[in-house]
Amino acid sequence: MELAKGNAEIQVGIADYKVAASPNRLITLGLGSCVGVVLYDPVKKVGGLLHIMLPDSTQFNNVTKPAKFADTGIPLMIDEIKRLGGIPSRLTAKLAGGAQMFSGLDEKFVLNIGQRNSKMVKEILSRMGIRILAEELGGNRGRTMIFDIASGQVTIRTIGSPLKVI
């Protein structure tokens, strides 16, 4: 994880996260069944964007990328936001992704990863006392998530749909 400085648009890869302060923007592409989690301290104007792939790390023996999972990635990102001066009790969340990318398949073959990711993210945020201000979850289309730290706005670009600000 690297700390972003200045006025930049910083890419967040799959199974990764970035934290930054205003006036930076964080962007992640390819949110299908993955979930993008934005955490923001509106007073300090610092925040982060996490791109999780799976809900739970406990099913794996050797977790080398904790940002891949909701249960390990969210606490990790909160720790980094605290290093920038963010206060956990002030954090708010915005979520996107969690799509069912393989619609039309026989139900018994579908793992519902998107739905499970969304559910786990919400459970973890609730346990940590972090309020979800907005979400753009589900459906069957990929999304791009752009987080403007200066304003706290998150713009969602969904294939075949107009831009949506949450």
From Swiss-Prot:
GO MF, one annotated term: protein-glutamine glutaminase activity
Catalytic activity from the UniProt record: L-glutaminyl-[protein] + H2O = L-glutamyl-[protein] + NH4(+)
Gene3D superfamilies linked: 3.30.1330.200
The keyword Hydrolase is annotated on this UniProt entry: yes
HAMAP family to which the protein is assigned, alphabetical: CheD
Family to which this protein belongs: Belongs to the CheD family.
Full protein name: Probable chemoreceptor glutamine deamidase CheD
Lineage: Bacteria, Bacillati, Bacillota, Clostridia, Eubacteriales
Name of the encoding gene: cheD
